[in-house]
Amino acid sequence: MSRMPRYKLTIEYDGAPFCGWQLQPALPSVQGALEAAALATCGEAVRVHGAGRTDAGVHALGQVAHVDIPKPFRADKLRDALNAHLRPNPVAVLAAEIVPDTFEARFSAVRRHYRYRIANRRSNLALDLGKVWRVPKPLDTDAMHRAAQVLIGKHNFTTFRDTECQAASPEKTLDVLDVIRDGDAVDIITNARSYLHSQVRSMVGSLVWVGEGRWTADDLAAALAARRRSACGPVAPPEGLYLMQVDY
């Protein structure tokens, strides 16, 4: 018997209405919305596997998933059918392609790219409410960028991971952590092969403390070296975080 065709999906979503990517009983999830759309499309229950298990409120412009569909579809037809059944959820399948059955959205990934958006202004948010973190106190983004380089490379990131994180090891290798300002918009760009639970938001919150003058780069280095969750700065809220792209 021939194997079911495997499809790679590229997905964007607004994370606000969801408990996160991962299925949870009686709660709306991105994975659940996609699996319901797949069931409506092919008539059978299937499992959709994501590259990144984003938390509640976190958005994606380039999440990747794979799914085995029990009957063959042309890739563009599958994309359109899933999108039709996803409405009115704020989830869109941007692309679908047939891939070998050895492809795994999570385990085949070699790099994940995240962007954290900050609005550094005193005024309330009108258009970007729920899409950025408004920080009213002026931020020294040059100091933030310099301090961020302390975290580049392979480290024990225990300080910057959630206490509920289930990763076997706290060691991760951070390839990029840049802080970029354009007017009152501050973007924190990072990429790595993988991250610990809440690692990006924990790093962002600590960098904001640097930007506000509460911490220096040495304080950030000391927090990293402490390998203790209580040494972390505040955890940035989820609404500013975006999974931008996954590389294979």
UniProtKB/Swiss-Prot annotation:
Reaction catalysis annotation: uridine(38/39/40) in tRNA = pseudouridine(38/39/40) in tRNA
Any GO BP: tRNA pseudouridine synthesis
Catalytic residues (positions): D55
CDD domains for this protein: PseudoU_synth_EcTruA
Enzyme Commission number, as recorded: 5.4.99.12
Matches recorded under InterPro entries: PsdUridine_synth_cat_dom_sf, PsdUridine_synth_TruA, PsdUridine_synth_TruA_a/b_dom, PsdUridine_synth_TruA_C, TruA/RsuA/RluB/E/F_N
Keyword annotations of the record: Isomerase, tRNA processing
Tree of life domain: Bacteria
Protein residues bound to substrate: Y114
Entry GO MF terms: RNA binding; tRNA pseudouridine(38-40) synthase activity
Function, in words: Formation of pseudouridine at positions 38, 39 and 40 in the anticodon stem and loop of transfer RNAs.
Entry-linked PANTHER family: PSEUDOURIDYLATE SYNTHASE, TRNA PSEUDOURIDINE SYNTHASE-LIKE 1
NCBIfam families per the UniProt record, alphabetical: hisT_truA (TIGR00071)
Subunit structure: Homodimer.
Family: Belongs to the tRNA pseudouridine synthase TruA family.
Protein name, per record: tRNA pseudouridine synthase A
Organism: Rhodopseudomonas palustris (strain ATCC BAA-98 / CGA009)
Gene coding for it: truA
